């Protein structure tokens, strides 16, 4: 636990807050501006550290706690470890109802903290100080377990939190915990190897589990050794460099047609560390009806999906052991040639999309291309909901391993800015770039100030198309009328008002600038890298 993100209220300031102040030189506390933003930043931090470090988020009872429920959902959907600690109502119930308490007439032990139950892996309410001796080791073990990883919640009733307790000295002994690497069953490995040897058109789907297993190098070696084309999920993007000969692009709804052309013709899919969500599988329409699946996953729940041959184990170790069984087996020249042709199609497609066509405003793809040119190999790029996930998934050619974060598990608007703060905190020696739409900016922007307050700089590119354009396209494309998505189609006399994002960002302390052309954007990105604090670049884009 390298740090705490906190907003203090009466439910935590006189207990946990007091203790944190006494140990301020040992564990830093970063002041949040919004409890949801804190949680989103902590989730992004966990992803940027590849689940090797965990932040704590603490809030008061009531609205401070419920504000974190959405962030817990993000962490839960993306299998990311975050420890949420909220104040709770009095265990004794003597002062009930306390400030911010929601009363349940027929269930007096229920509080709003019970809302965390569906969105965390581990939930506990500490009703006696001694319970920490049991609860804390269990939740830490869960958050470090690749098969069970996710957020945890502790509720601290205000009277219990204020109690003194003589914890045994050995409870505070320093412990070094290793992330376990489970080994797959030998029979399952043999079955998977047989299926691969028998296949004519195999393809690997690389998911986020590749990153968390630190399996990228092994995946690259195994794919090249056996001639396996590799497509990536959104969470698995940057598992391979875009220049790797086995890289075949991003698949799925937000992916590229060229990559999907490989997947649709595959007779065997080797899914590595992926949940196989609907945007990855096209709601299972991407695959042939007779396609077989081998699923390598630390979590049995995921490995069993879609009737796959489940190989339950650590991705890195399982790929290595599977390659040993395959020995000198290599896929057919015809299949390798098809994948290579699709790869050429993908490169040509992206090159055309990001090129300057002389028209204004710029397209999303052109903005992505400009940021890509400005980024160094080890820089980090981040986005989330709306149209940008598809644009970055297709148009971002990964220059470095594990340098890409698109929150598309919970698809949470607002993750972009808060997440950039957390990622910048996790990777202070590289530049973090975040791309955000105007809708998400308006939904959650206060962590621009949080990043300046804490000194964790990032570069934010705001793509302004005056509304929720991607949902507008879905609305109209499915036969509906344009309504309540674009500003021009919204109800009210202010529908023609455009937000001055540059001025707003400047008011939060950021360097900020408006740009309109690719040259202006390139110059602004170069200047932002030299600035001493967060920079915001605003560009109007096509709908």
Residues covered by each model-derived region:
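Thiamine diphosphate
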Residues: 74, 93-107, 253, 303-304, ...
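Phosphate/pyrophosphate-binding active-site segments
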Residues: 127-130, 153, 168, 294-385, ...
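Conserved short loop/turn motifs at secondary-structure junctions
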Residues: 207-211, 359, 437-439
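Active-site diphosphate/adenylate-binding microenvironment
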Residues: 9-20, 343-429
């Amino acid at each position: 636990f390298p740090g705490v993100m906190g907003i203090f209220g009466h439910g935590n300031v006189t207990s946990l807050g007091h203790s944190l102040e006494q140990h301020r030189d040992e564990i830093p506390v970063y002041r949040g501006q919004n409890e949801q933003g804190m949680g989103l930043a902590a989730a992004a931090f966990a992803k940027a550290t590849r689940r090797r470090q965990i932040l704590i988020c603490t809030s008061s009872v009531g609205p401070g706690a419920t504000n974190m429920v959405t962030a817990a959902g993000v962490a839960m959907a993306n299998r990311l470890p975050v420890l949420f600690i909220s104040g709770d109502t009095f265990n004794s119930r003597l002062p009930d109802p306390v400030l911010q308490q929601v009363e349940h007439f027929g269930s007096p032990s229920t509080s709003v903290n019970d809302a965390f139950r569906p969105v965390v892996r581990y939930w506990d309410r500490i009703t006696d100080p001694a319970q920490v001796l049991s609860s804390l080791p269990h939740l830490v073990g869960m958050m470090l377990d690749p098969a069970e990883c996710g957020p945890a919640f502790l509720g601290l009733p205000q009277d219990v939190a204020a109690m003194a307790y003589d914890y045994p000295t050995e409870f505070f002994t320093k412990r070094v915990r290793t992330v376990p690497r489970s080994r797959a069953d030998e029979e399952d490995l043999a079955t998977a190897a047989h299926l691969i040897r028998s296949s004519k058109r195999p393809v690997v789907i690389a998911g986020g589990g590749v990153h968390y297993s630190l399996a990228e190098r092994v995946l690259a070696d195994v794919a090249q050794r056996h001639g396996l084309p590799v497509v990536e999920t959104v969470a698995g993007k940057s598992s391979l460099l875009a220049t790797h000969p086995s890289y075949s692009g991003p698949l799925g709804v937000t992916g590229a047609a060229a990559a999907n052309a490989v997947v649709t013709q595959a007779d065997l899919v080797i899914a590595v560390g992926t949940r196989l969500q609907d945007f990855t599988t096209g709601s299972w329409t991407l695959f042939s009806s007779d396609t077989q699946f081998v699923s390598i996953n630390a979590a049995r729940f995921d490995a069993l999906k879609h009737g796959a041959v489940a190989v339950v184990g650590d991705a890195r170790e399982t790929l290595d052991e599977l390659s040993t069984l395959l020995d000198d087996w290599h896929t057919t020249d015809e299949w390798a040639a098809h994948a290579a042709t699709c790869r050429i199609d993908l490169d040509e497609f992206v090159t055309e999309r990001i090129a300057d066509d002389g028209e204004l405003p710029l397209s999303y793809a052109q903005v992505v291309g400009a940021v890509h040119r400005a980024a160094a190999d080890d820089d980090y790029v981040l986005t989330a909901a709306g149209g940008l996930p598809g644009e970055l998934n297709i148009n971002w050619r990964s220059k470095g391993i594990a340098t890409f974060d698109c929150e598309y598990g919970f698809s949470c608007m607002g993750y972009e800015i808060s997440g950039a703060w957390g990622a910048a905190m996790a990777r202070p020696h590289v530049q973090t770039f975040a791309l955000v739409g105007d809708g998400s900016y308006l939904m959650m922007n206060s962590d621009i100030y949080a990043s300046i307050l804490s000194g964790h700089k990032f570069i934010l590119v705001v793509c302004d198309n005056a509304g929720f354009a991607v949902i507008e396209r879905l609305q109209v494309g499915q036969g509906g009328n344009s309504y309540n998505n674009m500003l021009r189609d919204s109800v009210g006399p202010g529908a023609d008002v455009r937000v001055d994002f540059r001025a707003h960002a400047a008011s939060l302390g950021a360097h900020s600038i408006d740009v309109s052309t690719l040259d202006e954007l390139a110059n602004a990105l170069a200047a932002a890298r030299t600035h001493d604090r967060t920079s915001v670049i605003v560009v109007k884009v096509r709908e």
